[in-house]
Amino acid sequence: MAEVILLCGKIAVGKTTYAAYLQRNRNAVVLSCDELMLSLFDSCLGDKHDATVKRCSLYLSGIADQVVAAGVDVVLDFGSWTAAERDAVRTFFAEHNIPVRLYYLFCEESARSERLRLRNIALRNADGRVYIIEEDLRRRLDAKFELPSENETDKLIDTTHLTV
């Protein structure tokens, strides 16, 4: 049976890179909340951002339900920063009898800082809407991250040396 893989980790740990790896190697479909948000909305939604992310996540979960029903694995590149967000995803798919596996991605802080620095440089020269994450924003977002418990984590992935 096809399954949903929920990626969890802080900014710049390699979730999107690992999602692309799974897409190639498992023939999975990747659904990204960031990609949907950037294609539909201005990069700054202010106080509406969290509610909009929740709605996008729900929409993509519905698409994932259909893809899994067709027999294809789905990788949710959502970040899944809080226990409540992860619980909501698991509850949704449990109600549809779809297995969910949580992959927690992490890396050394030095690797993460360098990835974010390089990503910001590349994005400043990119066309279209992008998320530039400066150091002060990164610290604020990191403070919101809730480490997943052992009970909710199916796979730990150290991406410090990830080169897929």
Report residues per predicted region.
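Pre-Walker A (Motif I) flank of P-loop NTPase domains
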Residues: 1-5, 71-72
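NTP-dependent small-molecule kinase module
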Residues: 5, 92, 143-164
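P-loop (Walker A) phosphate-binding loop of NTP-binding proteins
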Residues: 10
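Conserved substrate/cofactor phosphate-moiety recognition/catalytic segment
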Residues: 13, 17-72
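Conserved beta-strand scaffold positions in the cores of enzyme catalytic domains, especially
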Residues: 28-30, 100-104, 153-158
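Conserved nucleotide-binding/hydrolysis micro-motifs of P-loop NTPases
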Residues: 35-37, 106-112, 163
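Glycine-rich phosphate-binding loop used to anchor ATP phosphates in small-molecule kinases
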Residues: 52-100
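A glycine- and Lys/Arg-enriched "phosphate-lid" helix/loop adjacent to the NTP-binding pocket
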Residues: 95-146
